[in-house]
Amino acid sequence: MASEKYYIYVLYCADNSFYCGFTNNVKRRFHTHQTYQGAKYTRVKKRHPLKLIYSEEFESKHDALSAEYYFKHQTRRQKEKFLLDHGVDLLKLRRN
């Protein structure tokens, strides 16, 4: 039996903020955020449109939740460095 995969994902919001979450299905979870049914943070209209800018797969729920916790407790500068180190073009995001 194949074990379930878990993911963290990062959304870039229209107000220039980041939202990090945890899921076992990134596509479905992103859709819930886009339709204002996700986390309270992403239900705010001024944060839309949202862009899915990063996701990472984990073998265990514990590892994914730990990574989400770690990301959420970083400073803005540390989050930006993490995203840049993982190939996210923040300058391009801000221009669009």
UniProtKB/Swiss-Prot annotation:
InterPro entries: GIY-YIG_endonuc, GIY-YIG_endonuc_sf, UPF0213_domain
Residues covered by the GIY-YIG domain: 4-81
Organism: Limosilactobacillus reuteri (strain DSM 20016)
Family in the record: Belongs to the UPF0213 family.
Name assigned to this protein: UPF0213 protein Lreu_0682
Organism lineage: Bacteria, Bacillati, Bacillota, Bacilli, Lactobacillales
